[in-house]
């Protein structure tokens, strides 16, 4: 019975709340933060468990009242109402029972990089950036440009954003991979369609509770920042390169004039990249290999094609095709792709869990 499956979650929630009120925990900030997060993640399922228990009780009481001539009419109404609510509530609960991606509530670093296709790829990085900015705006999320490398022909060779807001990772995690674009460049006189590609990486923003890097494992190099064509060259050593020695991951940052600010930004991205690598290794070790994402989220996996001559956008993971490319891009309507992806993932996970 569903109530039996909900019981451990309710017990765990009550146990965490008890622990949070103990002086021993309140003095340990790191542990308290971790437990508070866990309690918050359990709240939705605990609320639904109460709602479900109330409906089950209502059904049982209404059935008992059916034998009472004075109460039978009212009991029938109550029973009908409760039984109509039950299937929808059960579906909601089944989805909540699925293993939750621990990163779903986190902010993200979104990195878009030009791949094959030269100038056309760089221009599409700019177009995809605008579409993501509109999407973030629709959601009420805050966006900060962390790092950018502009292309001479317009667009970007690479850009990294920090996106903050409610459940950012839970929606944008599906964007990781290769995005292929097919269109006629403005410089193309023969009207030939060119194919180019950009890669998107989605990394959760992490803090010291998620990952702690030993300063001994980090090599920091400082240098003078170089501007395009010798412009805006910083005469002080403000550019920073950080290397995490155990993983070999390197981050370079020169966007800010202050060395300290570049160090802070580089450290943020370094933590996110190391966390992502360790998380991928952990999931691969337990055989999940990024099942939390539809597809691997790997840069090399082609996830989507944007065909401008046909006004078509296709997501290859679920075979979804929409002939509204211009509108989706200009208005940032990514929910039209993300919602079906989430539904697909949930259906697969429910089947796997036997729910």
From Swiss-Prot:
Modification after translation (UniProt): Methylated by PrmC. Methylation increases the termination efficiency of RF1.
SMART domains (alphabetical): PCRF (SM00937)
Keyword hit for Isomerase: no
A Pfam family this chain is assigned to: RF-1
Subcellular location: Cytoplasm
Molecular function in Gene Ontology: translation release factor activity, codon specific
Cited InterPro entries: PCRF, Pep_chain_release_fac_I, Pep_chain_release_fac_I_sf, Prokaryotic/Mito_RF, RF-1
Subcellular location, principal: cytoplasm
One GO cellular component term: cytoplasm
Keyword annotations of the record: Cytoplasm, Methylation, Protein biosynthesis
N5-methylglutamine: modified positions: 231
Function: Peptide chain release factor 1 directs the termination of translation in response to the peptide chain termination codons UAG and UAA.
Family: Belongs to the prokaryotic/mitochondrial release factor family.
HAMAP family in the cross-refs: Rel_fac_1
Protein name in the entry: Peptide chain release factor 1
Organism for this UniProt entry: Nautilia profundicola (strain ATCC BAA-1463 / DSM 18972 / AmH)
